[in-house]
């Protein structure tokens, strides 16, 4: 028997929302789940190629590792100190 008042609320018809439209329903502990990419618009499933830059990943990579090919210094590891 599960303990009372320790389990999250279960929503058997939780809505998956992509670009403001409900794309599917699933069971979840949240009533609504907002996603940017799902199987209906993912390039692998649709057969199209497009660049997806989520939260500036490319910019972050260029900032961190962009100067390595130009003779720049390597980034420090977390434990290394100068």
Swiss-Prot record:
Matches recorded under Gene3D superfamilies: Ribosomal protein L31
Pfam families in alphabetical order: Ribosomal_L31
GO molecular function terms listed in the Swiss-Prot or TrEMBL record: rRNA binding; structural constituent of ribosome
Keywords tagged on the record: Ribonucleoprotein, Ribosomal protein, RNA-binding, rRNA-binding
Alphabetized InterPro entries for the sequence: Ribosomal_bL28/bL31-like_sf, Ribosomal_bL31, Ribosomal_bL31_A, Ribosomal_bL31_sf
Gene Ontology biological process terms from the UniProt entry: translation
SUPFAM superfamilies linked to this entry: L28p-like
Gene Ontology CC terms: ribonucleoprotein complex; ribosome
Domain of life: Bacteria
Keyword Kinase applies: no
Matches recorded under HAMAP family: Ribosomal_bL31_1
Subunit structure: Part of the 50S ribosomal subunit.
Protein name: Large ribosomal subunit protein bL31
């Amino acid at each position: 028997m599960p303990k009372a008042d320790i389990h999250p609320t279960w929503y058997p018809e939780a809505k998956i929302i992509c670009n403001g439209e409900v794309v599917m329903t699933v069971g979840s502990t949240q009533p609504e789940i907002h996603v940017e990419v799902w199987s209906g618009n993912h390039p692998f499933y649709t057969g199209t190629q497009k660049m997806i830059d989520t939260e500036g990943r490319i910019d972050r990579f260029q900032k961190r590792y962009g100067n390595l090919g130009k003779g720049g210094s390597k980034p420090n590891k977390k434990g290394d100190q100068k």
